[in-house]
Curated annotation (Swiss-Prot):
Function per UniProt: May play a role in protein trafficking. May act as a linker molecule between the submembranous matrix on the luminal side of zymogen granule membrane (ZGM) and aggregated secretory proteins during granule formation in the TGN.
Primary localization: secreted
GO MF annotations, alphabetized: carbohydrate binding; peptidoglycan binding
CDD domains, sorted: Jacalin_ZG16_like
Protein name as it appears in the record: Zymogen granule membrane protein 16
Gene Ontology terms: cellular component: collagen-containing extracellular matrix; Golgi lumen; mucus layer; zymogen granule membrane
Secretion signal, residue range per the UniProt entry: 1-16
Source species, domain of life: Eukaryota
Family that this chain belongs to: Belongs to the jacalin lectin family.
Organism name: Mus musculus (Mouse)
Every Jacalin-type lectin domain range: 24-159
Length: 167
């Protein structure tokens, strides 16, 4: 009798795990193979993405920094070029990232759930278009490779954090 009860409990647990919805997905890597790896995976614990600082020159994206909640990530990339900064509105999220690349990331265009279109860089190279695989998910963090420029970029998607009331 105990064996039957354990079997039923095990089957119920396996069934519950199999129907648990998935929310995270990954897009990338777009760009070249150079540079040193970086990841903002730990930064997502500070909150949702709330702003971008992106340095561009006339050829490609040189560097980037992302604000998670109220905390800026470490800057990655080079120092040459113009620094552009854009803040998201409270509760606004990135739901699509498209752009161009060759050996470096040349362009990134962030599209938000409020209909805003935020372009950085130059439109030349191979196109990419990154969207989450699962509904009701947003851009949570960025990873990639960088040196004197942003060599490649990857986008990581998941649900908007429920613990951030002021973001």
């Amino acid at each position: 009798m105990l064996a039957v009860a354990l079997l039923v409990l095990l089957c119920a647990s396996a069934s519950a795990n199999s129907i648990q919805s998935r929310t995270s997905s990954y897009s990338g890597e777009y760009g070249g193979k150079g540079g040193k790896r970086f990841s903002h995976s730990g930064n997502q614990l500070d909150g949702p993405i709330t702003a971008f600082r992106i340095r561009v020159n006339r050829y490609y994206i040189v560097g980037l920094q992302v604000r998670y909640g109220t905390v800026w990530s470490d800057y990655v990339g080079g120092t040459q070029g113009d620094l552009e900064e854009i803040f998201l509105h409270p509760g606004e999220s990135v739901i699509q990232v498209s752009g161009k690349y060759k050996s470096y990331v040349k362009q990134m265009i962030f599209v938000t759930d409020k209909g805003r279109y935020l372009p950085f860089g130059k439109a030349s190279g191979t196109s990419f278009n990154a969207v989450p695989l699962h509904p009701n998910t947003v851009l949570r963090f960025i990873s990639g490779r960088s040196g004197s420029a942003i060599d490649s970029i990857s986008l990581h998607w998941d649900t908007y954090p429920s613990h951030c009331n002021t973001c």
